[in-house]
Amino acid sequence: MSSLESSSESIAVNILGQTNRRVARAQAQAFIDTLKPLQHPNSQKLYLQGSRADLRVGMRQILQTDTRIGGRAAAPNVEKNPPIPVYDCAGPYSDPAAQINVRQGLAKLRLPWIIERQDTEVLDCTTSDFTQQRLKDDGLDHLRFEAGSSAIIRPRRALPGKRVSQLHYARQGIITPEMEYVAIRENMALADVQDEILNRRGQGESFGAVIGKPITPEFVRDEIARGRAIIPLNINHPEAEPMTIGRNFLVKVNANIGNSAVTSSIEEEVEKLVWSTRWGADTVMDLSTGRYIHETREWIIRNSPVPIGTVPIYQALEKVNGVAEHLTWEVFRDTLIEQAEQGVDYFTIHAGVLLRYVPMTAKRVTGIVSRGGSIMAKWCLSHHQENFLYTHFREICELCVAYDVSLSLGDGMRPGSIADANDEAQFAELETLGELVNIAWEYDVQTIIEGPGHIPMQLIKENMDKQLIHCAEAPFYTLGPQITDIAPGYDHFTSGIGAAMIAWYGCAMLCYVTPKEHLGLPNKQDVKQGLIAYKIAAHAADIAKGHPGAQIRDNALSKARFEFRWEDQYNLGLDPDTARAYHDESLPQESAKVAHFCSMCGPKFCSMKITQDVRDYAASLEADAKAQSLAAETDGALAPLGSVQQVKSGHSELSHIDAELNYIAVKTQDELTAAMAQKSAEFAALGAKLYLPLDNANAANELAKHKDGAKLQSKTQVAKV
């Protein structure tokens, strides 16, 4: 190819890329302009009332259809199925009664609670030099909230000498409204579900976690006070709904969003925020590295019902034009203040990347893969000084506790391939993070620990065990881990497996991985795919740990599946839209919505349908046996039943009947064959049709009796196979 051809092709690709970005931005703008609350199919927003009028905990309940247990089509006998309550991260975005206006931001849910504690002050203006510079730039006005918007708030800070963290309050024995909110939210109203089938569950294995106790406000306070859980809520983010991260609570999932220098816009990031909460993101990290980081973050925070995290070193690096060697503590400190006053709820700080650890990575296959870790490693080597995040860590803590910003101690030495897993550099940093968490606790700063990464399955538990030992049970927050490196494009699978395992062992929050991991910046659909994969992993871990009520949704869906309640199957799932679409690909007819089979096995080989028929056959024999028993009591004689010998009277008769019924329930192969032959005859007698008109339903019920006297049971207008 000539240089001219190469240049032309490059120009064409660039034009196409710009066109695609314009289209994406326009679509995101349209999404924001028309944004209305959106609920999942057949779901309702539910609010549980706390101890005070302004403490209403939002969640979702999935409504179910009735189960038909007999009767005629025109007058069926039904069994009511209860609504299933589920955790909801979407805040007002899933409430049809909410008035959504992205340009006004969300309601300040927690502001009254913050004000009444009387330990904060409203600042006259921001104290960050960078923020003041941005506000003076009129050229950025088009990126800001309009003057007078309710989204604009003046920043708050702790009064001199005060600490305003949830950890500080917990250690004082104070149960805050945030703690009560969390307790109600974690219980999810599952105590109201009394159905025996829905509450079935196996014995969990919690690996030392305190699972099974009622989640009371006092339990939440105690976990926070011990440092085993956090409630990441900046006093400047009153829009956020309280949630907790800790291994004795439900496993949480974080979603990453953020623009870069080459793609995405503010509109797209706000769209991804709303999209993330719809699909279950418990927290969102804004990892923006491109232009307008400050303005993008402002729009995200003011419209976020979930905690927002950042990696401040990314923006600090932008301020020194991307040259790591030019970073200073002063630039970084101003960045912390800027973000804390905006309302960032937790900072990822790579303070454990020490100068002496950098040479430990020299023989790694993939070296240092953490972006923040590599930035600090380069700074340490270029200055041949200790990491300034480590040497200034106490100052970082003093700043964080003034806004209740939680710390997420970053794993800058995490392995980037399974070949590097559990090596010296990784565990050396982990020990340092344990040292730092104890310093943070001296200042009442809520803290979690970040973890790997790429770890083969057999080495995962060692990571959890060492973290608990070195970090005094501070919550663990991991990226996966990815358990194999052979599947680019499918790393939400390879990491989801590891995520489920480490969450079962005790990890408190999982950072999602999308199909674009290692390949590019995720779009909306990638975000959804990553979240669904990780919600599966988190939920599977909750079940394995033995969380009370965690399995209720599974049992409800299984019951719906067995009863061929197709709509309930879709709606009880994590992604109703996809489930419905997959079913309709092969069976699009409306009649298929009530069919007692799917396209996998077809009408003649559905195991669940066959099982139902066998149950009906056994039930008919049981009914006949009971009738004979009653007749025997009246006439003084007992009609023969199978091979059961006739007995004279009373309890002896009933015990023999029970023994025979137990035998029927077990079923020999011959009896199963006979039962299927009978159903085959019934099917043929009805004209071998899969579906019967509604006006023929009664006629079907009156079908001629077969040799054994069993009647055709027609639970629906769909003919039994």
From Swiss-Prot:
Cofactor note: Binds 1 [4Fe-4S] cluster per subunit. The cluster is coordinated with 3 cysteines and an exchangeable S-adenosyl-L-methionine.
Molecular function terms, GO-annotated: 4 iron, 4 sulfur cluster binding; carbon-carbon lyase activity; zinc ion binding
Name of one Pfam family that matches: ThiC-associated
Residues annotated for Zn(2+) binding in this entry: 454, 518
Keywords, in A-Z order: 4Fe-4S, Iron, Iron-sulfur, Lyase, Metal-binding, S-adenosyl-L-methionine, Thiamine biosynthesis, Zinc
Family note: Belongs to the ThiC family.
Protein name in the entry: Phosphomethylpyrimidine synthase
